[in-house]
Structures are given as structure tokens and as C-alpha cells.
Design a protein with these regions (language model features):
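Cytosolic, long alpha-helical scaffolding segments
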Residues: 2-185
Length: 185
């Protein structure tokens, strides 16, 4: 077994490609790949605090976008249940938790470095916003869990209630869009 593994080791990527061609994924099995922006947080950048702060801001923006997407999927699933979107909310929550851990740790290291007043303000702002994005993701998860529970119990809203939920949902999405745009600038 060891010899066979060693012989086939260089062909790993080719074998994976062959396997996926032989047994393709169905649409339900396909999972959207989410790049991990926390890879931008290299400890070597801590020697250049201004650059490290810029990288943190970029990761914060990606975290905001993930929270926004999670909230949109959750809101949509309340009135029009979609198992794929609900699963994505759970995945996004895990990813956002990962971002919070990585970014929080990096910001703690960065806050011990000599920072300009502007960079110090940015780091402080990132700490606050990071918690807000994580909280938004938690609320999205709660909505997704409610949607799952309603689906399992075969409960639905009246047409009037659905209409009101769609109106409120669109308003929340617009507020989130404006918030993410404001955070970016």
C-alpha cells in the first residue's frame, strides 16, 4: 500500500480531476467556493503597520460581504424556503466565525505596534465592526434555523404576512447594502 501511494502521489490532482469527470456533482451537491481572505493577514506585515492595517481593512470588507450574503439568504429562505441557501447560511456563519477569530487575533498583535492616529482609529473601528458583522451572521443563522423549523413543521405565513415580510426583508437588505458600502469607503 505504501509503495502504491508513493507511486501515485505525483498524480493526485490528475486523479481527482478524473474522479470528478467520472462522477460529476449534481447541482444540489455543488458548493460555492468561498476564498479565505484571512490569508492576507501575514505576520510579516506587522513590521509595516500601515500596510497591515490596510490588509485588515480588506479582510473586514470581505467579512462584511459574507455577513451581507448570509443575511440575504436567510431572509429569502423565510418566505421562500431554499435548502441550499439555508445550508449556505450555516457555512457562511462558520466562515465568519473563522474571520472573527483570525482578524481579532491579528488586530490584537497589530494594536501593540506603533500606529498613526488614523491607523489607530481604523483598528478600533475594525474591532467594533467585526463584532457587528459576526452578530449579523448570528441573526442570519437564527432566521435560517427558523426557516428550517417552519419547513419541517410544514408551517407557512399567510399571503399578507409573506408580502409584509418581503417588504421588510427588502428594506433590511437595502440597509445592509448601504452599510457595507459605507464601511468600504
Amino acid at each position: 500500500n505504501i509503495a502504491a501511494t508513493l507511486v501515485l502521489l505525483p498524480f493526485g490532482k490528475v486523479l481527482v480531476k478524473l474522479a470528478t469527470l467520472t462522477i460529476p456533482e449534481t447541482e444540489d451537491e455543488k458548493v460555492e467556493e468561498i476564498p479565505d481572505a484571512t490569508k492576507l493577514l501575514d505576520t510579516r506585515f506587522l513590521e509595516k503597520p500601515a500596510f497591515a492595517v490596510a490588509q485588515c481593512k480588506n479582510v473586514g470588507i470581505e467579512m462584511a460581504k459574507l455577513a451581507q450574503r448570509s443575511l440575504e439568504y436567510a431572509i429569502d429562505s423565510i418566505t421562500d424556503y431554499d435548502q441550499k441557501k439555508v445550508k449556505d447560511v450555516f457555512r457562511l456563519e462558520d466562515m465568519i466565525d473563522h474571520y472573527e477569530d483570525e482578524l481579532g487575533t491579528y488586530l490584537m498583535k497589530l494594536s501593540g505596534k506603533p500606529l498613526s492616529d488614523e491607523d489607530n482609529h481604523t483598528v478600533s473601528n475594525l474591532f467594533h465592526c467585526m463584532g457587528d458583522f459576526e452578530r449579523i451572521s448570528d441573526h442570519a443563522l437564527n432566521l435560517a434555523e427558523t426557516a428550517m423549523e417552519m419547513q419541517a413543521k410544514e408551517e407557512t405565513f399567510s399571503e399578507k404576512a409573506k408580502g409584509e415580510l418581503v417588504t421588510y426583508g427588502e428594506a433590511v437588505k437595502e440597509i445592509m447594502d448601504l452599510s457595507v458600502e459605507a464601511y468600504k469607503s
